């Protein structure tokens, strides 16, 4: 069977996807270890039987709802490719605004803390774009291992490292100029209603407690001992709860200039506190 025939078969096989042909193209390129442009330009080329079998399996996973990023093992974020697996959330485009806000603030070799780092997308992106020293924490040893590998692959491991720990606990007694956190913020009661792609992601990276802000309450209690001068705090949350998080942040830091920053879609997504 030819490349073009396999692409047509794959498109039909992932019909449950919102973008079946695009997904089939990605999966076929992955199965054949080729670029997408090659697939499109070489429709008459034959496909080896082993590669065809592999492609069928990949399509079955996608049709069952598994996210493309988990199948391919990589996800794009802020112009770079990050290794991902089911021990971490898949980086979201809306989270890139946290990086942009941090970049506007960072001047020189400041110290940055990324709490709940996951695959290290935020931390590694900041380290790649600035001379800052970036540390990250995560409760999951598997996430920290993955983030460490991403830092190595991106060439920033000399200034970007990660530790296993609960929120900022591993860095108690240290001071930071930028603290960024994208903690679990989905209310527990909302988890069963989430669409299939999210159901493949680790629950502990999604569950924000009864109102989605449980971990942020704890983090805000820890932050006063971690702040250097000047300092920027960036916290991502869901649009329905962002106002409450902003009020909590203002209460924790009465002298701070607290604002809500929209994401690329114009949704209120980030609390920004300048101290």
Question: What is each PLM-predicted segment?
Answer:
Residues 1-21:
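Non-catalytic nucleic-acid substrate-recognition regions in nucleic-acid-modifying enzymes
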Residues 26-104:
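Conserved AdoMet
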Residues 17-18, 130, 152-157, 250-257:
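Short helix-capping segments at alpha-helix termini
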Residues 93-192, 197:
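Conserved SAM/SAH cofactor-binding pocket of Class I
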Residues 27, 65, 95, 122, ...:
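Residue-level signal for inorganic ion chemistry
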Residues 139-144, 196-228, 232, 238-242:
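Glycine-rich S-adenosyl-L-methionine
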Residues 69, 186-189, 240:
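Active-site beta-alpha loop architecture of Rossmann-like, nucleotide-cofactor-dependent enzymes
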Residues 232-275:
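C-terminal catalytic and target-recognition region of SAM-dependent MTase-like enzymes
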């Amino acid at each position: 069977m030819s490349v073009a025939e396999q692409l047509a078969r794959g498109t039909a096989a992932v019909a449950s996807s919102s973008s079946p042909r695009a997904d089939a193209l990605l999966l076929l390129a992955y199965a054949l270890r080729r670029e997408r442009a090659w697939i499109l330009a070489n429709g008459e080329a034959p496909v080896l039987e082993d590669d065809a079998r592999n492609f069928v399996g990949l399509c079955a996973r996608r049709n069952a709802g598994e996210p493309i990023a988990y199948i391919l093992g990589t996800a794009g974020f802020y112009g770079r490719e990050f290794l991902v697996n089911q021990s971490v959330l898949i980086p979201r485009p809306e989270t890139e605004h946290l990086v942009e806000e941090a970049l506007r603030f960072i001047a020189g070799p400041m110290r940055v803390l990324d709490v709940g780092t996951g695959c290290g997308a935020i931390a590694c992106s900041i380290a790649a774009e600035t001379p800052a020293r970036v540390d990250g924490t995560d409760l999951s040893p598997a996430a920290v291992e993955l983030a460490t590998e991403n830092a190595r692959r991106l060439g920033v491991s000399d200034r970007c490292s990660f530790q296993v720990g609960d929120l900022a606990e591993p860095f108690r007694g240290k001071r930071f100029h930028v603290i960024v956190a994208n903690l679990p913020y989905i209310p527990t009661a909302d988890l069963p209603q989430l669409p299939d792609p999210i159901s493949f992601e680790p629950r502990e990276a999604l569950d924000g407690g009864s109102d989605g802000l449980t971990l942020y309450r704890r983090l805000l209690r820890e932050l006063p001992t971690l702040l250097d001068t000047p300092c920027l705090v960036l916290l991502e949350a869901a649009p329905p709860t962002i106002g409450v998080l902003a009020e909590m942040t203002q209460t924790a830091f009465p002298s701070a200039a607290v604002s809500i920053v929209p994401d690329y879609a114009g949704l209120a997504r980030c609390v920004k506190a300048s101290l």
